[in-house]
Amino acid sequence: LGEKPFTCMECSKSFSQKSNLQTHYKIHTGEKPFTCMECGRTFSQKSTLLSHYKMHTGERPFSCSECGKSFSHKNKLTLHQKIHTGEKPYACTECGKRFPEKSKLKIHWKIHTREKPFSCTECGKKFSRESNLYFHQKMH
């Protein structure tokens, strides 16, 4: 129970099924075979594309019982609810700033490392966030 024998050689993340490892590995190779027919954005995983489609349909079935705000994904609601509880379990080891989400801490950490792993294929400008690159590329 809970055994994950398939490990990614790039980042050491483990999976219970070989097919999940193969799907995950596309993140590292940059392969993005799934394209949104609405906006042209590409994805490495089919599940991510299907999740992305909710942005276009406006589907938001998960509502916050505290304030009524609705979300397209249950995990987004769970993260939002930390606003009401004030929970910030993730702390930066460099400066002590705390975050409600691990992903926000990872983004913040790039301030300290000055890491900018996302670069524009058109002009070469680099970004610390993929979302900033995405919006920048729309300007070309």
Curated annotation (Swiss-Prot):
GO cellular-component term (any): nucleus
Keywords: DNA-binding, Metal-binding, Nucleus, Repeat, Transcription, Transcription regulation, Zinc, Zinc-finger
GO terms of molecular function: DNA-binding transcription factor activity, RNA polymerase II-specific; RNA polymerase II cis-regulatory region sequence-specific DNA binding; zinc ion binding
PROSITE patterns named in the record: ZINC_FINGER_C2H2_1, ZINC_FINGER_C2H2_2
Any single Pfam family the record assigns to this protein: zf-C2H2
Record bears the keyword Transit peptide: no
Subcellular location field: Nucleus
Zinc finger residue ranges, C2H2-type: 6-28, 34-56, 62-84, 90-112, 118-140
Domain of life: Eukaryota
Protein family membership: Belongs to the krueppel C2H2-type zinc-finger protein family.
Role description: May be involved in transcriptional regulation.
Protein's name in the database: Gastrula zinc finger protein XlCGF49.1
